[in-house]
C-alpha cells in the first residue's frame, strides 16, 4: 500500500509590490521544495494577488510514519523561511482510501 501526503501552503508576502516579484519568490520556493524534499508543487490559488499565494505540494511514500515525518520537515522548513507569513495544512491518505479506477 502507498500513501499520499498533500500539503497546502498558504503564503503572505507583505513586502512584495508586484506579481512579478511574487512569481520570482514562488519560482525559487517551488524549486527548493522539489530539490530538497522531492515534492511535486503547483500554485493552486490566489494567482492574481501579488501579496498572497497558495501552493499545493504532494509527497508519496510506502510508509505513513516516514511520510508524516517528511511532511513535518517541509512544514518546519517553510515556516523557517516565512515565520510570520505562512500556514501549512497537512493531509495524509492511503491509496486504498482514494477512489481510483
Per-range role (PLM):
Residues 27-31, 38, 72:
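Solvent-exposed alpha-helix faces
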Residues 13-18, 61-64:
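A generic structural motif
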Residues 42-62:
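Short, charge-patterned binding micro-sites
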Residues 39-45, 88-89:
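A short linear hydrophobic-aromatic micro-motif
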Residues 4-11:
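Active-site-flanking beta-strand signature of metal-NTP-handling nucleotidyl enzymes
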Residues 22:
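C-terminal binding/interaction regions
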Residues 61-101:
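C-terminal structural segments of small proteins and small subunits
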Residues 37-40, 81-82:
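Short catalytic/binding micro-motifs of nucleotide second-messenger systems
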Amino acid at each position: 500500500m502507498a500513501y499520499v501526503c498533500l500539503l497546502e501552503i498558504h503564503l503572505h508576502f507583505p513586502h512584495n509590490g508586484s506579481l512579478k516579484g511574487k512569481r520570482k519568490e514562488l519560482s525559487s520556493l517551488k524549486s527548493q521544495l522539489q530539490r530538497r524534499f522531492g515534492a511535486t508543487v503547483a500554485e493552486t490559488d490566489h494567482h492574481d494577488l501579488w501579496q498572497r499565494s497558495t501552493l499545493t505540494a504532494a509527497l508519496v511514500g510506502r510508509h505513513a510514519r516516514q511520510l508524516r515525518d517528511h511532511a513535518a520537515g517541509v512544514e518546519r522548513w517553510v515556516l523557517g523561511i516565512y515565520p510570520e507569513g505562512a500556514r501549512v495544512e497537512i493531509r495524509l491518505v492511503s491509496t486504498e482510501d482514494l477512489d481510483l479506477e
